[in-house]
């Protein structure tokens, strides 16, 4: 797979096989970010149908969209994202990585450009994904199909989201802190192959190594998930 100017020199890739509850998934991302020395890509799964909603979305708005699904507030921004039939991933970029100095929008676009190329290379959904492209917003009124009810992330494409036949299939949200940048993304295609994950990783970095979540990180994340992400104070903070 040909690649030009990948975002990272080296990337640690974690394909987490265990479906986990939303609060634990969010906590694992935060703990990995706090310990990232370079860049980490994590693919993960959910143990039940759920929605995640951005830091600035109100609980009242998110609960309307959730229905009877589980809910978790993200540390990142963005809108409301359905989980369970998607492939969810996160990228943690440590502050000592050269990539951390890039503008957040540039990181967003480059991640999605690699994702788009990986989708087209593996073509997991047949001819549909062969026409995947990045969204380019020319002005606020150029798309009449945008539906902003309930802050629905996938009804509201922003620049560099991944589109197929006019519909958004991949988006992400970010948070940048002194210790690094967290990029949390969702691809609304749950049947993507291991080959897709491999090619996506290859396109992001000059080299990547596979790893797993160690017990110390998992233990710390379990405590953080219980005390922060599963707590009413966090869920109802807005």
Question: Model-derived features: where do they sit?
Answer:
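Short terminal or interdomain "cap/linker" segment that borders an active site or interface and mediates
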Residues: 15-18, 151-179, 184
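Long, positively charged amphipathic alpha-helical accessory segments at protein N-termini or as interdomain linkers
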Residues: 112-147, 152, 174-238
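Short connector loops at helix/strand junctions that flank enzyme active sites
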Residues: 48, 66, 82-86, 157, ...
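Active-site loop/lid in soluble adenylation, ligation, and acyl-transfer enzymes
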Residues: 2-66, 70-74, 80, 90, ...
């Amino acid at each position: 797979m040909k690649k030009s100017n990948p975002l990272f020199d080296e990337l640690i890739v974690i394909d987490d096989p265990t479906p986990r509850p939303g609060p634990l998934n969010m906590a694992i991302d935060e703990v990995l970010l706090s310990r990232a020395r370079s860049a980490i890509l994590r693919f993960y799964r959910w143990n039940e149908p759920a929605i995640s909603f951005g830091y600035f979305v109100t609980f009242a708005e998110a609960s309307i969209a959730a229905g009877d699904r589980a809910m978790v507030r993200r540390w990142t921004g963005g809108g409301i994202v359905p989980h369970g039939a998607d492939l969810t991933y996160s990228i943690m970029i440590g502050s000592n990585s050269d990539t951390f100095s890039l503008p957040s929008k540039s990181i967003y676009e480059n991640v999605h450009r690699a994702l788009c190329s990986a989708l087209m290379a593996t073509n997991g959904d047949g001819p549909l994904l062969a026409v995947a492209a990045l969204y380019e917003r020319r002005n606020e009124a150029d798309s009449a199909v945008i539906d902003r009810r309930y802050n629905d992330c996938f009804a509201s494409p922003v620049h560099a989201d991944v589109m197929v036949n006019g519909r958004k299939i991949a988006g992400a949200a970010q948070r940048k802190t002194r210790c690094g940048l967290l990029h949390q993304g969702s691809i609304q295609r749950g049947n993507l192959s291991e080959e897709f994950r491999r090619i996506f990783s290859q396109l992001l970095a000059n080299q990547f190594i596979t790893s797993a979540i160690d017990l110390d990180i998992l233990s710390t994340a379990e405590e953080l998930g219980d005390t922060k992400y599963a707590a009413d104070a966090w869920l109802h903070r807005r």
